[in-house]
Protein backbone atom coordinates (compact mmCIF):
# COMPACT_ATOMS: atom_id res chain seq x y z
CA UNK A 1 0.00 0.00 0.00
CA UNK A 2 2.78 2.43 0.90
CA UNK A 3 4.48 1.95 -2.49
CA UNK A 4 1.20 2.41 -4.36
CA UNK A 5 0.36 5.56 -2.36
CA UNK A 6 3.81 6.99 -3.13
CA UNK A 7 3.19 6.31 -6.83
CA UNK A 8 -0.26 7.98 -6.70
CA UNK A 9 1.28 11.04 -5.05
CA UNK A 10 4.09 11.20 -7.61
CA UNK A 11 1.66 11.29 -10.57
CA UNK A 12 -0.93 13.41 -8.76
CA UNK A 13 -3.69 10.81 -9.11
CA UNK A 14 -6.03 11.64 -6.25
CA UNK A 15 -8.78 9.34 -7.61
CA UNK A 16 -6.56 6.26 -7.54
CA UNK A 17 -5.17 7.33 -4.18
CA UNK A 18 -8.69 7.62 -2.77
CA UNK A 19 -9.48 4.09 -3.96
CA UNK A 20 -6.38 2.83 -2.15
CA UNK A 21 -7.49 4.79 0.93
CA UNK A 22 -10.87 3.02 0.83
CA UNK A 23 -9.10 -0.35 0.57
CA UNK A 24 -6.95 0.55 3.59
CA UNK A 25 -10.10 1.36 5.60
CA UNK A 26 -11.92 -1.82 4.54
CA UNK A 27 -8.94 -3.96 5.57
CA UNK A 28 -8.63 -2.25 8.96
CA UNK A 29 -5.10 -0.89 8.41
CA UNK A 30 -5.92 2.74 9.20
CA UNK A 31 -4.41 2.50 12.69
CA UNK A 32 -0.98 1.84 11.17
CA UNK A 33 1.05 5.02 11.73
CA UNK A 34 3.41 4.57 8.75
CA UNK A 35 0.52 3.82 6.40
CA UNK A 36 -1.46 6.78 7.74
CA UNK A 37 1.50 9.08 7.15
CA UNK A 38 1.83 7.73 3.59
CA UNK A 39 -1.87 8.45 3.00
CA UNK A 40 -1.51 11.99 4.25
CA UNK A 41 1.62 12.55 2.16
CA UNK A 42 -0.21 11.29 -0.95
CA UNK A 43 -3.09 13.72 -0.45
CA UNK A 44 -0.68 16.62 0.12
CA UNK A 45 1.18 15.84 -3.11
CA UNK A 46 -2.18 15.70 -4.94
CA UNK A 47 -3.12 19.11 -3.42
CA UNK A 48 -6.13 17.50 -1.68
CA UNK A 49 -5.27 19.30 1.53
CA UNK A 50 -8.60 18.99 3.31
CA UNK A 51 -8.45 15.20 2.89
CA UNK A 52 -4.85 15.25 4.11
CA UNK A 53 -5.90 17.24 7.17
CA UNK A 54 -8.72 14.75 7.87
CA UNK A 55 -6.28 11.82 7.70
CA UNK A 56 -3.91 13.65 10.06
CA UNK A 57 -6.69 14.18 12.61
CA UNK A 58 -7.49 10.45 12.51
CA UNK A 59 -3.90 9.29 13.08
CA UNK A 60 -3.48 7.58 16.47
CA UNK A 61 -0.22 9.47 16.96
CA UNK A 62 0.68 12.73 15.21
CA UNK A 63 4.34 13.58 14.71
CA UNK A 64 6.20 16.73 13.66
CA UNK A 65 6.96 15.20 10.24
CA UNK A 66 3.24 14.76 9.54
CA UNK A 67 2.42 18.33 10.55
CA UNK A 68 5.34 19.61 8.45
CA UNK A 69 3.97 17.90 5.33
CA UNK A 70 0.54 19.48 5.81
CA UNK A 71 1.90 22.93 6.67
CA UNK A 72 4.18 22.88 3.60
CA UNK A 73 1.21 21.82 1.45
CA UNK A 74 -0.93 24.71 2.66
CA UNK A 75 1.90 27.19 2.06
CA UNK A 76 2.48 25.85 -1.46
CA UNK A 77 -1.22 26.29 -2.25
CA UNK A 78 -1.20 29.86 -0.88
CA UNK A 79 -3.48 28.93 2.05
CA UNK A 80 -1.12 30.52 4.53
CA UNK A 81 -3.74 31.24 7.21
CA UNK A 82 -4.43 27.51 7.42
CA UNK A 83 -0.69 26.83 7.64
CA UNK A 84 -0.46 29.23 10.60
CA UNK A 85 -3.46 27.57 12.25
CA UNK A 86 -1.79 24.16 11.88
CA UNK A 87 1.40 25.59 13.37
CA UNK A 88 -0.51 26.73 16.47
CA UNK A 89 -2.47 23.47 16.74
CA UNK A 90 0.71 21.41 16.47
CA UNK A 91 2.29 23.28 19.39
CA UNK A 92 -0.90 23.04 21.44
CA UNK A 93 -0.49 19.25 21.21
CA UNK A 94 2.92 19.56 22.84
CA UNK A 95 4.98 19.09 19.67
CA UNK A 96 8.09 21.20 19.17
CA UNK A 97 8.63 22.75 15.71
CA UNK A 98 11.86 21.82 13.95
CA UNK A 99 13.89 23.64 11.28
CA UNK A 100 11.61 22.38 8.48
CA UNK A 101 8.53 23.67 10.32
CA UNK A 102 10.07 27.09 10.86
CA UNK A 103 11.16 27.41 7.21
CA UNK A 104 7.61 26.70 5.97
CA UNK A 105 5.90 28.93 8.50
CA UNK A 106 8.26 31.85 7.83
CA UNK A 107 7.34 31.55 4.16
CA UNK A 108 3.67 31.73 5.17
CA UNK A 109 4.34 34.89 7.22
CA UNK A 110 6.17 36.51 4.31
CA UNK A 111 3.43 35.66 1.83
CA UNK A 112 0.68 37.02 4.09
CA UNK A 113 2.73 39.99 5.32
CA UNK A 114 2.06 39.02 8.95
CA UNK A 115 5.18 40.62 10.36
CA UNK A 116 4.11 40.22 14.03
CA UNK A 117 3.90 36.44 13.62
CA UNK A 118 7.23 36.50 11.81
CA UNK A 119 8.97 38.40 14.61
CA UNK A 120 7.50 36.04 17.20
CA UNK A 121 8.86 33.04 15.29
CA UNK A 122 12.23 34.79 14.93
CA UNK A 123 12.40 35.09 18.73
CA UNK A 124 11.61 31.38 19.12
CA UNK A 125 14.39 30.49 16.69
CA UNK A 126 16.88 32.66 18.58
CA UNK A 127 15.73 31.22 21.90
CA UNK A 128 16.51 27.72 20.71
CA UNK A 129 19.85 28.70 19.17
CA UNK A 130 18.91 27.36 15.73
CA UNK A 131 20.35 30.13 13.55
CA UNK A 132 23.88 28.81 13.68
CA UNK A 133 22.89 25.44 12.22
CA UNK A 134 23.13 25.88 8.45
CA UNK A 135 21.75 28.62 6.22
CA UNK A 136 18.16 27.42 5.69
CA UNK A 137 16.62 29.26 8.65
CA UNK A 138 18.64 32.43 8.15
CA UNK A 139 17.67 32.56 4.48
CA UNK A 140 14.01 31.98 5.37
CA UNK A 141 14.14 34.85 7.88
CA UNK A 142 15.70 37.21 5.33
CA UNK A 143 13.04 36.21 2.81
CA UNK A 144 10.23 36.80 5.33
CA UNK A 145 11.46 40.25 6.37
CA UNK A 146 12.14 41.28 2.76
CA UNK A 147 8.67 40.21 1.61
CA UNK A 148 7.16 42.21 4.48
CA UNK A 149 9.23 45.25 3.42
CA UNK A 150 11.23 45.34 6.69
CA UNK A 151 14.60 45.64 4.97
CA UNK A 152 16.53 46.86 8.01
CA UNK A 153 15.78 43.56 9.77
CA UNK A 154 16.43 41.54 6.62
CA UNK A 155 19.87 43.16 6.25
CA UNK A 156 20.60 42.67 9.95
CA UNK A 157 19.88 38.93 9.71
CA UNK A 158 22.02 38.71 6.57
CA UNK A 159 24.99 40.43 8.21
CA UNK A 160 24.77 38.16 11.26
CA UNK A 161 24.86 34.97 9.17
CA UNK A 162 28.37 33.54 9.41
CA UNK A 163 27.97 31.36 6.32
CA UNK A 164 25.73 33.42 4.05
CA UNK A 165 25.53 32.24 0.46
CA UNK A 166 24.06 33.38 -2.86
CA UNK A 167 20.59 32.21 -1.72
CA UNK A 168 20.86 34.54 1.30
CA UNK A 169 21.65 37.50 -0.93
CA UNK A 170 18.98 36.53 -3.46
CA UNK A 171 16.32 36.60 -0.73
CA UNK A 172 17.21 40.24 0.03
CA UNK A 173 17.62 41.14 -3.65
CA UNK A 174 14.21 39.65 -4.52
CA UNK A 175 12.56 41.74 -1.80
CA UNK A 176 14.13 44.96 -3.05
CA UNK A 177 13.22 44.04 -6.64
CA UNK A 178 9.60 43.45 -5.63
CA UNK A 179 9.50 46.95 -4.14
CA UNK A 180 11.09 48.46 -7.28
CA UNK A 181 14.19 49.64 -5.40
CA UNK A 182 16.67 49.33 -8.24
CA UNK A 183 19.63 51.06 -6.59
CA UNK A 184 19.48 48.73 -3.59
CA UNK A 185 19.32 45.68 -5.87
CA UNK A 186 22.41 46.82 -7.79
CA UNK A 187 24.27 47.59 -4.54
CA UNK A 188 23.43 44.16 -3.11
CA UNK A 189 24.72 42.43 -6.24
CA UNK A 190 27.99 44.39 -5.98
CA UNK A 191 28.39 43.61 -2.26
CA UNK A 192 27.68 39.95 -2.89
CA UNK A 193 30.43 39.82 -5.51
CA UNK A 194 32.93 41.51 -3.17
CA UNK A 195 32.39 38.52 -0.85
CA UNK A 196 33.45 36.20 -3.66
CA UNK A 197 29.94 35.02 -4.49
CA UNK A 198 28.85 34.84 -8.13
CA UNK A 199 25.34 35.92 -9.19
CA UNK A 200 23.23 33.00 -10.37
CA UNK A 201 20.16 32.77 -12.57
CA UNK A 202 17.82 33.94 -9.78
CA UNK A 203 20.02 36.98 -9.14
CA UNK A 204 19.87 38.01 -12.79
CA UNK A 205 16.11 37.42 -13.01
CA UNK A 206 15.54 39.78 -10.06
CA UNK A 207 18.02 42.30 -11.42
CA UNK A 208 16.49 42.40 -14.91
CA UNK A 209 12.99 42.70 -13.46
CA UNK A 210 13.81 45.78 -11.41
CA UNK A 211 15.92 47.37 -14.17
CA UNK A 212 12.94 47.07 -16.49
CA UNK A 213 10.54 48.53 -13.94
CA UNK A 214 12.86 51.48 -13.24
CA UNK A 215 13.91 51.80 -16.92
CA UNK A 216 17.60 51.75 -15.98
CA UNK A 217 18.68 50.90 -19.52
CA UNK A 218 22.40 51.75 -19.15
CA UNK A 219 22.83 49.27 -16.29
CA UNK A 220 20.59 46.88 -18.20
CA UNK A 221 23.02 46.84 -21.14
CA UNK A 222 25.93 46.09 -18.78
CA UNK A 223 23.99 43.23 -17.21
CA UNK A 224 23.14 41.91 -20.69
CA UNK A 225 26.85 41.80 -21.57
CA UNK A 226 27.62 40.04 -18.27
CA UNK A 227 24.93 37.42 -19.00
CA UNK A 228 26.37 36.78 -22.47
CA UNK A 229 29.91 36.46 -21.06
CA UNK A 230 28.70 33.88 -18.54
CA UNK A 231 26.89 31.90 -21.24
CA UNK A 232 23.61 31.99 -19.32
CA UNK A 233 21.41 32.46 -22.40
CA UNK A 234 22.26 28.91 -23.46
CA UNK A 235 21.48 27.46 -20.03
CA UNK A 236 18.16 28.95 -18.93
CA UNK A 237 15.38 30.31 -21.15
CA UNK A 238 14.08 32.43 -18.25
CA UNK A 239 17.13 34.69 -18.48
CA UNK A 240 16.48 35.39 -22.16
CA UNK A 241 12.81 36.06 -21.48
CA UNK A 242 13.76 38.48 -18.69
CA UNK A 243 16.06 40.33 -21.08
CA UNK A 244 13.18 40.69 -23.54
CA UNK A 245 11.06 42.01 -20.65
CA UNK A 246 13.73 44.50 -19.54
CA UNK A 247 14.23 45.99 -23.02
CA UNK A 248 10.46 46.07 -23.61
CA UNK A 249 9.82 47.93 -20.34
CA UNK A 250 12.52 50.42 -21.30
CA UNK A 251 10.69 51.07 -24.59
CA UNK A 252 13.47 49.49 -26.69
CA UNK A 253 11.20 47.04 -28.48
CA UNK A 254 13.35 46.62 -31.57
CA UNK A 255 16.18 45.51 -29.27
CA UNK A 256 13.77 43.28 -27.33
CA UNK A 257 12.71 41.58 -30.55
CA UNK A 258 16.35 41.19 -31.64
CA UNK A 259 17.17 39.50 -28.32
CA UNK A 260 14.19 37.19 -28.76
CA UNK A 261 15.14 36.24 -32.30
CA UNK A 262 18.71 35.42 -31.20
CA UNK A 263 17.65 33.17 -28.30
CA UNK A 264 18.80 29.57 -28.84
CA UNK A 265 15.37 28.43 -27.65
CA UNK A 266 12.23 30.52 -27.35
CA UNK A 267 8.87 29.52 -25.95
CA UNK A 268 5.38 30.96 -25.57
CA UNK A 269 6.54 33.05 -22.58
CA UNK A 270 9.23 34.66 -24.78
CA UNK A 271 6.64 35.76 -27.32
CA UNK A 272 4.08 36.76 -24.68
CA UNK A 273 6.66 39.04 -23.09
CA UNK A 274 7.38 40.76 -26.41
CA UNK A 275 3.71 40.98 -27.40
CA UNK A 276 2.87 42.52 -24.00
CA UNK A 277 5.73 45.01 -24.44
CA UNK A 278 4.41 46.14 -27.82
CA UNK A 279 0.92 46.42 -26.34
CA UNK A 280 2.13 48.58 -23.43
CA UNK A 281 3.86 50.93 -25.88
CA UNK A 282 0.68 51.00 -28.03
CA UNK A 283 2.50 49.47 -30.99
CA UNK A 284 -0.41 47.14 -31.56
CA UNK A 285 0.26 46.23 -35.18
CA UNK A 286 3.69 44.95 -34.17
CA UNK A 287 2.01 42.91 -31.43
CA UNK A 288 -0.31 41.36 -34.01
CA UNK A 289 2.66 40.62 -36.30
CA UNK A 290 4.44 38.83 -33.43
CA UNK A 291 1.31 36.79 -32.78
CA UNK A 292 1.39 35.54 -36.37
CA UNK A 293 5.15 34.91 -36.32
CA UNK A 294 4.88 32.94 -33.08
CA UNK A 295 2.30 30.61 -34.59
CA UNK A 296 4.37 30.24 -37.76
CA UNK A 297 7.11 28.80 -35.52
CA UNK A 298 4.69 26.11 -34.36
CA UNK A 299 4.01 27.57 -30.91
CA UNK A 300 0.46 27.54 -29.61
CA UNK A 301 -0.91 30.66 -27.89
CA UNK A 302 -1.94 30.33 -24.25
CA UNK A 303 -4.35 32.37 -22.14
CA UNK A 304 -1.78 35.14 -21.58
CA UNK A 305 -1.16 35.39 -25.34
CA UNK A 306 -4.87 35.73 -26.04
CA UNK A 307 -5.31 38.40 -23.34
CA UNK A 308 -2.43 40.48 -24.76
CA UNK A 309 -3.53 40.11 -28.37
CA UNK A 310 -7.18 40.92 -27.62
CA UNK A 311 -5.97 44.17 -26.07
CA UNK A 312 -4.07 44.93 -29.29
CA UNK A 313 -7.15 44.15 -31.40
CA UNK A 314 -9.25 46.51 -29.29
CA UNK A 315 -6.70 49.32 -29.52
CA UNK A 316 -6.38 49.04 -33.33
CA UNK A 317 -10.03 48.26 -34.05
CA UNK A 318 -9.01 44.95 -35.64
CA UNK A 319 -12.45 43.43 -35.15
CA UNK A 320 -12.07 40.66 -37.76
CA UNK A 321 -8.90 39.44 -36.06
CA UNK A 322 -10.62 39.74 -32.70
CA UNK A 323 -13.53 37.58 -33.87
CA UNK A 324 -11.07 34.98 -35.19
CA UNK A 325 -9.32 34.86 -31.81
CA UNK A 326 -12.68 34.63 -30.05
CA UNK A 327 -13.45 31.55 -32.13
CA UNK A 328 -10.10 29.98 -31.18
CA UNK A 329 -10.82 30.65 -27.50
CA UNK A 330 -14.23 28.97 -27.78
CA UNK A 331 -12.72 25.95 -29.55
CA UNK A 332 -10.20 25.56 -26.72
CA UNK A 333 -12.99 25.91 -24.07
CA UNK A 334 -10.90 28.53 -22.25
CA UNK A 335 -13.75 30.81 -21.15
CA UNK A 336 -15.01 28.28 -18.61
CA UNK A 337 -11.97 28.64 -16.40
CA UNK A 338 -10.55 32.15 -16.86
CA UNK A 339 -12.54 35.28 -16.03
CA UNK A 340 -9.63 37.56 -17.05
CA UNK A 341 -9.81 36.18 -20.59
CA UNK A 342 -13.58 36.70 -20.68
CA UNK A 343 -13.13 40.29 -19.53
CA UNK A 344 -10.51 40.83 -22.26
CA UNK A 345 -13.05 39.67 -24.86
CA UNK A 346 -15.71 42.05 -23.55
CA UNK A 347 -13.15 44.87 -23.57
CA UNK A 348 -12.06 44.10 -27.16
CA UNK A 349 -15.60 44.16 -28.56
CA UNK A 350 -16.48 47.27 -26.53
CA UNK A 351 -13.42 49.20 -27.75
CA UNK A 352 -14.21 48.20 -31.35
CA UNK A 353 -17.73 49.60 -30.90
CA UNK A 354 -19.44 46.21 -31.30
CA UNK A 355 -21.39 46.79 -28.12
CA UNK A 356 -24.19 44.28 -28.65
CA UNK A 357 -21.60 41.52 -29.05
CA UNK A 358 -19.69 42.78 -26.01
CA UNK A 359 -22.84 42.58 -23.91
CA UNK A 360 -23.66 39.11 -25.26
CA UNK A 361 -20.18 37.85 -24.31
CA UNK A 362 -20.55 39.35 -20.84
CA UNK A 363 -23.97 37.77 -20.27
CA UNK A 364 -22.63 34.36 -21.35
CA UNK A 365 -19.63 34.43 -18.99
CA UNK A 366 -19.92 31.69 -16.33
CA UNK A 367 -18.72 34.22 -13.74
CA UNK A 368 -18.86 38.02 -13.94
CA UNK A 369 -17.10 40.54 -11.73
CA UNK A 370 -16.87 44.33 -11.52
CA UNK A 371 -14.09 44.36 -14.14
CA UNK A 372 -16.40 42.58 -16.61
CA UNK A 373 -19.07 45.24 -16.24
CA UNK A 374 -16.54 48.09 -16.25
CA UNK A 375 -15.25 46.92 -19.65
CA UNK A 376 -18.76 47.13 -21.10
CA UNK A 377 -19.54 50.41 -19.34
CA UNK A 378 -16.33 51.94 -20.73
CA UNK A 379 -17.48 50.97 -24.23
CA UNK A 380 -20.87 52.59 -23.72
CA UNK A 381 -19.16 55.70 -22.35
CA UNK A 382 -16.70 55.86 -25.27
CA UNK A 383 -19.54 55.77 -27.79
CA UNK A 384 -21.93 58.05 -25.84
CA UNK A 385 -24.58 55.43 -25.03
CA UNK A 386 -25.85 56.91 -21.77
CA UNK A 387 -29.14 54.98 -21.38
CA UNK A 388 -27.44 51.63 -22.02
CA UNK A 389 -24.70 52.48 -19.52
CA UNK A 390 -27.27 53.34 -16.85
CA UNK A 391 -29.14 50.11 -17.59
CA UNK A 392 -25.94 48.07 -17.18
CA UNK A 393 -25.06 49.97 -14.02
CA UNK A 394 -28.40 48.99 -12.48
CA UNK A 395 -28.16 45.37 -13.63
CA UNK A 396 -24.64 45.05 -12.23
CA UNK A 397 -25.82 46.19 -8.80
CA UNK A 398 -28.79 43.82 -8.99
CA UNK A 399 -26.23 40.99 -9.27
CA UNK A 400 -24.82 42.06 -5.91
CA UNK A 401 -21.66 43.66 -7.30
CA UNK A 402 -20.38 46.85 -5.67
CA UNK A 403 -19.31 49.65 -8.06
CA UNK A 404 -15.75 50.91 -7.73
CA UNK A 405 -14.01 54.14 -8.75
CA UNK A 406 -13.66 52.99 -12.37
CA UNK A 407 -17.35 52.01 -12.59
CA UNK A 408 -18.50 55.46 -11.51
CA UNK A 409 -16.06 57.15 -13.90
CA UNK A 410 -17.47 55.12 -16.80
CA UNK A 411 -21.11 55.89 -15.93
CA UNK A 412 -20.41 59.61 -15.41
CA UNK A 413 -18.50 59.72 -18.69
CA UNK A 414 -21.41 58.04 -20.49
CA UNK A 415 -23.81 60.58 -18.97
CA UNK A 416 -21.55 63.49 -19.93
CA UNK A 417 -21.29 62.34 -23.55
CA UNK A 418 -25.04 61.79 -23.90
CA UNK A 419 -26.26 64.88 -22.00
CA UNK A 420 -27.80 62.96 -19.08
CA UNK A 421 -27.45 65.84 -16.59
CA UNK A 422 -29.96 64.72 -13.94
CA UNK A 423 -28.61 61.18 -13.83
CA UNK A 424 -25.01 62.45 -13.61
CA UNK A 425 -25.87 64.87 -10.79
CA UNK A 426 -27.68 62.18 -8.82
CA UNK A 427 -24.80 59.72 -9.18
CA UNK A 428 -22.19 62.35 -8.28
CA UNK A 429 -24.18 63.41 -5.20
CA UNK A 430 -24.54 59.80 -4.00
CA UNK A 431 -20.93 58.76 -4.58
CA UNK A 432 -19.80 59.20 -0.99
CA UNK A 433 -23.02 58.47 0.89
CA UNK A 434 -24.23 55.48 -1.14
CA UNK A 435 -21.02 53.96 -2.54
CA UNK A 436 -18.41 55.16 -0.04
CA UNK A 437 -16.23 56.63 -2.80
CA UNK A 438 -14.72 60.12 -2.66
CA UNK A 439 -14.92 61.86 -6.05
CA UNK A 440 -11.64 61.84 -7.97
CA UNK A 441 -10.33 64.40 -10.45
CA UNK A 442 -11.74 62.28 -13.27
CA UNK A 443 -15.21 62.33 -11.69
CA UNK A 444 -15.09 66.13 -11.36
CA UNK A 445 -13.95 66.42 -14.98
CA UNK A 446 -16.96 64.37 -16.13
CA UNK A 447 -19.28 66.68 -14.17
CA UNK A 448 -17.65 69.76 -15.69
CA UNK A 449 -18.24 68.29 -19.16
CA UNK A 450 -21.90 67.40 -18.59
CA UNK A 451 -22.66 70.76 -16.94
CA UNK A 452 -20.82 72.70 -19.62
CA UNK A 453 -22.52 70.83 -22.46
CA UNK A 454 -25.94 72.02 -21.28
CA UNK A 455 -24.73 75.56 -20.56
CA UNK A 456 -24.87 75.43 -16.72
CA UNK A 457 -21.71 77.49 -16.35
CA UNK A 458 -22.45 78.74 -12.82
CA UNK A 459 -22.54 75.11 -11.72
CA UNK A 460 -19.30 74.48 -13.64
CA UNK A 461 -17.54 77.08 -11.48
CA UNK A 462 -19.06 75.55 -8.34
CA UNK A 463 -17.89 72.09 -9.38
CA UNK A 464 -14.34 73.35 -9.97
CA UNK A 465 -14.32 75.16 -6.62
CA UNK A 466 -15.32 71.90 -4.93
CA UNK A 467 -12.40 69.99 -6.42
CA UNK A 468 -9.48 68.94 -4.18
CA UNK A 469 -7.20 70.76 -6.62
CA UNK A 470 -7.85 72.92 -9.68
CA UNK A 471 -4.40 72.15 -11.10
CA UNK A 472 -5.75 69.84 -13.79
CA UNK A 473 -5.19 70.65 -17.44
CA UNK A 474 -7.89 68.13 -18.43
CA UNK A 475 -10.52 70.01 -16.39
CA UNK A 476 -9.71 73.40 -17.92
CA UNK A 477 -9.64 71.94 -21.44
CA UNK A 478 -13.07 70.44 -20.72
CA UNK A 479 -14.29 73.92 -19.71
CA UNK A 480 -12.83 75.42 -22.90
CA UNK A 481 -14.56 72.76 -24.99
CA UNK A 482 -17.91 73.57 -23.36
CA UNK A 483 -17.34 77.32 -23.82
CA UNK A 484 -16.59 76.75 -27.51
CA UNK A 485 -20.00 75.13 -28.01
CA UNK A 486 -21.84 77.96 -26.26
CA UNK A 487 -19.57 80.89 -27.15
CA UNK A 488 -18.96 81.79 -23.48
CA UNK A 489 -15.99 84.14 -23.85
CA UNK A 490 -15.77 85.25 -20.20
CA UNK A 491 -15.43 81.77 -18.74
CA UNK A 492 -13.35 80.75 -21.75
CA UNK A 493 -10.75 83.43 -20.96
CA UNK A 494 -10.54 82.22 -17.35
CA UNK A 495 -10.13 78.60 -18.46
CA UNK A 496 -7.53 79.60 -21.07
CA UNK A 497 -5.39 81.48 -18.53
CA UNK A 498 -5.58 78.53 -16.11
CA UNK A 499 -4.57 76.13 -18.89
CA UNK A 500 -1.63 78.35 -19.83
CA UNK A 501 -0.56 78.49 -16.18
CA UNK A 502 -0.37 74.71 -16.15
CA UNK A 503 1.11 74.23 -19.64
CA UNK A 504 2.16 77.31 -21.58
CA UNK A 505 2.80 75.30 -24.74
CA UNK A 506 -0.63 73.60 -24.89
CA UNK A 507 -1.69 74.09 -28.52
CA UNK A 508 -5.14 72.61 -27.84
CA UNK A 509 -5.95 75.49 -25.47
CA UNK A 510 -4.99 78.06 -28.16
CA UNK A 511 -7.14 76.35 -30.79
CA UNK A 512 -10.15 76.10 -28.45
CA UNK A 513 -9.84 79.75 -27.39
CA UNK A 514 -9.66 80.86 -31.03
CA UNK A 515 -12.78 78.82 -31.76
CA UNK A 516 -14.57 80.44 -28.80
CA UNK A 517 -13.86 83.88 -30.24
CA UNK A 518 -14.98 82.73 -33.66
CA UNK A 519 -18.24 81.24 -32.37
CA UNK A 520 -18.96 84.48 -30.48
CA UNK A 521 -18.17 86.52 -33.62
CA UNK A 522 -15.36 88.30 -31.81
CA UNK A 523 -11.70 88.97 -32.48
CA UNK A 524 -8.97 88.39 -29.92
Give the positions of each predicted feature:
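Inter-helix linker motif
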Residues: 12, 28, 59, 63, ...
Amino acid sequence: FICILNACGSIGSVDKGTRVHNAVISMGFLEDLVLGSALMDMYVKCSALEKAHKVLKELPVREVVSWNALIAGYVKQGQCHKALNCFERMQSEGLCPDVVTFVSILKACGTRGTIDNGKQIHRKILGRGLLGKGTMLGNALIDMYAKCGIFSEAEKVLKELSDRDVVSWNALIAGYAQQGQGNEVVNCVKLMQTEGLCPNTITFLCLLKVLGRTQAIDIGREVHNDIVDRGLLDKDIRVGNSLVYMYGKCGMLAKAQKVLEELPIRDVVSWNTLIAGYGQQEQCQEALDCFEQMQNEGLYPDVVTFICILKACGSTGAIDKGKQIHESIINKCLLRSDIVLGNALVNMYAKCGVLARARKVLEELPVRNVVSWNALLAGYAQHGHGPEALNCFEKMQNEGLIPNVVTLSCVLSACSRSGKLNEAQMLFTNMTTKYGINPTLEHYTCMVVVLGNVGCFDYVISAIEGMPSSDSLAVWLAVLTACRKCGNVKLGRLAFHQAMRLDGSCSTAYVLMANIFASANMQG
